[in-house]
Regions:
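Extended, compositionally biased accessory segments flanking or bridging domains
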Residues: 1-52
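C-terminal-of-GTPase-core extension/linker across diverse P-loop GTPases
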Residues: 155-170
Length: 170
């Protein structure tokens, strides 16, 4: 699952960074990109996704910590379903604490966190390493398919899947 952090309007926007990243990574991993047709029903959506019987990537159009009408959250469901999750954060979010709060939220619910990916902006590896969060790297807006950065990120994603003792999607 690929998730973002922040306002619903930014996550649901056509071609949101979360959706673009999920589609690009799905292509690079040779996985289908699956839609979330009803974001207010996480257990049902995860059940449908799991029933496909194959690997997939989906982009969540809500912040995983956002309370749903029944009081649940996607973070809670992702943890209950042991769903490996990748967090996409826009470069403009890096100074806001969104990376740390997203990491803490997902860890609280025991979500298998694959890592964090910066969307756009310039990569400051020293700062990312200093914050101690599980950063995997950066994806550039509009980068060509098969770019070195995407290939490197896919390699790191596969390593994280292995480190978390999860089946690596093929």
């Amino acid at each position: 699952m690929v998730v973002g952090s922040g306002q619903e309007s930014l996550l649901r926007a056509p071609d949101s960074p979360t959706d673009q990243a999920a589609r690009r990574l799905a292509r690079a991993l040779a996985l289908p990109h699956r839609p979330i047709s009803d974001p207010h029903s996480p257990d049902r959506q995860l059940q449908l996704l799991q029933a496909s019987g194959e690997g997939w990537l989906a982009s969540l159009p809500l912040d995983p910590g956002q309370a749903l009408p029944d009081g649940s959250t996607w973070a809670e469901a992702l943890g209950a379903w042991c769903q490996p999750t990748l967090v996409i954060l826009g470069a403009q979010q890096l100074s806001s604490g969104a990376a740390a709060s997203s990491t803490a939220l997902l860890r609280q619910w025991r979500v298998p966190l694959l890592g964090l990916v910066q969307w756009g902006g310039s990569w400051k590896g020293d700062l990312r390493r200093r914050d101690g969060l599980p950063w995997l790297g950066r994806l550039e807006e509009g980068a060509a398919e098969g770019s070195d950065a995407t290939s490197d990120l896919v390699g790191l994603l596969r390593q994280r899947w292995t480190l978390l003792d999860l089946p690596v999607p093929s």
